[in-house]
Amino acid sequence: MRLTTTTLLLALALRAQAEVLCPDSIEVNQQATVAGDWTVLYTDPPLRLTGVTIYDGPPSQNHKVKPYSVKSARGELRVSWRLPESKRNFHLVCNYERTTASLTALLPPGMNGCNAVFDRRVSYGNDTLAVKRMVCN
């Protein structure tokens, strides 16, 4: 019985470690230089998550994984990606409002897919929606 409990706890711990999430927000230090009588103003951080892209291989190779499912209901847009076996590694790219800074993470082998829920009632320009939640597992 003790071995079964230990095995179950280990399996749960490994499952918990096998999730990858984009941070909800980031802080970016910007520095602008202007000539003349101009004054630089900055918007208040944090910058919220507005986009999720999955790549088959490094993002620089631009092999985007197409969503498997896109559903719209009750003010939400639900997007799912399946991650089949690939010779290249999958990468997750997280985009944020009001910045060109993005975060990228190599997804561990064995990930089956990613899911994101966007809030259709909150947009940030350039047709980007607020991400309510997302996870790859």
Each model region followed by its residue ranges:
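N-terminal signal peptide c-region/cleavage motif recognized by signal peptidases
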Residues: 13-17
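Positively charged n-region of N-terminal signal peptides that target proteins for export
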Residues: 1-4
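Mitochondrial intermembrane space
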Residues: 18-137
